[in-house]
């Protein structure tokens, strides 16, 4: 009996040690600044030593500079230690060094050139790695087929595959979703029509902008849609995600729920002088010659629009890219139309380019609105309703406005919670598959019709 008790204690002790074993981050070919943003903070139970595998070049050096800036800043400095492998065989090297138990306890972070990203995802899943990938996880129909295989493989190998959906952390988006779940305020989501959709979302982005306080120098391949992906298959992923996440909370969806997809695409012209400011390069590389509009301008197909119905809810999504903006930054517009009120996010000049949330009553009294808002005030202390002519502004305390760069850490926090349970919410995988079904099918349709 005594020996049996000792054995049980040893097993329990080993289980606790195993459960507390730190997670290892692996960064693969970090060509996009999002790869660094997930390390903008430290995490509990994560090893500060990060293995980085990449080819030699500016992408890698820029990534390491960003990590160093986080480590050396005066406020809340991080303590990351980057162990770097440079070489053309970086991917094969990563697979060899991340086998077995090491793989199960690791998170592979993918944010860079999208040309081979889906292939990397599939092979990493085959090797038993947990994967957190920046959007998009695929940029065309061929990639979508690989992605479907990757999700099947991840399930078979009992690992997680997840994409970085930062917009779910934006407080105006969170509260918009919350308000649409309150029947006393919102009523029911309208069905809408193709001409007057129930859900409309538009995001505007800029090639030249500031990140972490410095001008963002983008890699030359970012301007090549065959490597980065067209706008309709890239940033549009966020908008498709928000539409289904907001309208069908915690509901598993499939391609059978989608009807009447139409799509269009158009380019943003980028002059050589603008290209030089964006990338730091004086000439267009050879791989962009195919996109030349004339000797000094390329066309970048970064803009797109998708219209479709999701379980009968008419939805319109637009993703736009401009060169730069004299004021403000990327902007977001979203409206969800209910039978009692519309809930709208605006981020224009009138809002001083800060996203603001509005309730526009249609069939609800002021008393009903204020009463219905009370429970939300308890859940998010400090939010208030302020009347602005015929609509209401939801005043949001600054404590909730953590900012886009902080959202990457918040996504990682959620992913680490999922990894601790070794399980994603039931609806996440089918809805990720639907998301990329929509974007890749829309791209194919847009190319056919243009």
Task: Please report, for each region that a protein language model flagged, where it lies by residue.
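Sec/Tat signal peptide C-region and signal peptidase I cleavage site
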Residues: 15-19
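N-terminal glycine-/serine-/threonine-rich beta1-alpha1-beta2 phosphate-ribose binding loop
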Residues: 20-127, 142-161, 417-420
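A structural signal for well-ordered alpha-helical segments within the folded catalytic domains
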Residues: 58-61, 115-118, 122, 145, ...
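Short helix/strand-capping hinge loops at secondary-structure junctions
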Residues: 128, 134-137
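A contiguous active-site-proximal alpha/beta segment in oxidoreductase catalytic domains
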Residues: 138-215
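Rossmann-like dinucleotide-binding domain that binds NAD(P)(H)
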Residues: 213-316, 320-328
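C-terminal helical cap and adjacent loop that interface with cofactors, partners, or active-site loops
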Residues: 234, 239, 244, 251, ...
